[in-house]
Amino acid sequence: MTKNIEDILGAYEEITDDLYDDLEEALIMGDVGMQTATDIVRELRKRVDAGEVRNPKHAKMVIADIVAKMIDGGEDMGLVTVPSIIMVIGVNGAGKTTTIGKMAAMYKAQGKKVILGAADTFRAAAIEQLEVWADRAGVELVKHKEGSDPAAVVFDTIEAGLARDSDIIICDTAGRLHNKKNLMEELAKIYRIIDKKLPYCDREILLVLDATTGQNAVNQAKEFMNVAEITGIVLTKLDGTARGGVVLTIKNELKIPVKFIGVGEKLDDLQPFKPDVFAKALFENTEETHKDEDDE
């Protein structure tokens, strides 16, 4: 996306309607949704008309500023209480298990006591995969056998977290969308348990999405929004320039903040999302490619 935008701006000596059209097309091709691309170009037009933009070269900095303002807000995790609970949802292959392991390692490195709950009980090998990541992160895992009631796992994880004075409880939950009624009932049961056991606690419900799937990730988010009260997004397999357009669409059209981005395979490759840094990287001259995570 970055290179296409630079090429377009470099091809024009002055700002014209054709430039606006080419710019909008480049944004859409870069995984920015049509509505968001239109919003960006409309705001650029307003600033040009107001005399804030001198030439196409200057427009690049202005577009970066528009994007930064568009994606700003809500990215901080609102976890203050002890304990706080994080529920993580997402389809198979998005990087959900990997994300949970990295998140556990991140909070542990901050000096927090973390416990994990393996409540995605219906996916083959999900429990074993989370066990591997718990070992890598050096945190405790609560698990039941495959096919167990997910809500029972969450209940036992909360009990264990309270008994061990844990700061952060992270539960791996729903990983499928094919039966929305069952998923809604499962999540509702989990919510009731949290409300009963931890009525005072801060909570986040994070949806893990694979950035390489582009607009499909946005559609997936819309589907999950119908069954879960999502408070934030984790975008995995994200190279800051090639797939960054998804971030803009999620924040602008779905009004869900991106909380974390996954940029590699290592345990410390989960980063808190920083809108200003991201917007700047999106429009830098050089492109840095990050290694993708595992598909777990």
Region locations from a protein language model:
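A general structural signal for well-ordered secondary-structure junctions
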Residues: 31-33, 230, 288
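Short hydrophobic/aromatic residue motifs in ordered secondary structure
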Residues: 34-36, 123, 239, 267
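Short beta-strand segments
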Residues: 89-90, 172, 208, 262
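Structured loop/turn residues at secondary-structure junctions
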Residues: 119-122, 146, 212, 238
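Conserved catalytic-core segment of NTP-binding enzymes
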Residues: 129, 150-164, 178-284
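Short glycine-rich anion-binding loops that position phosphate/pyrophosphate groups of nucleotides
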Residues: 174-176
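Short acidic DE-rich linear segments
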Residues: 289-296
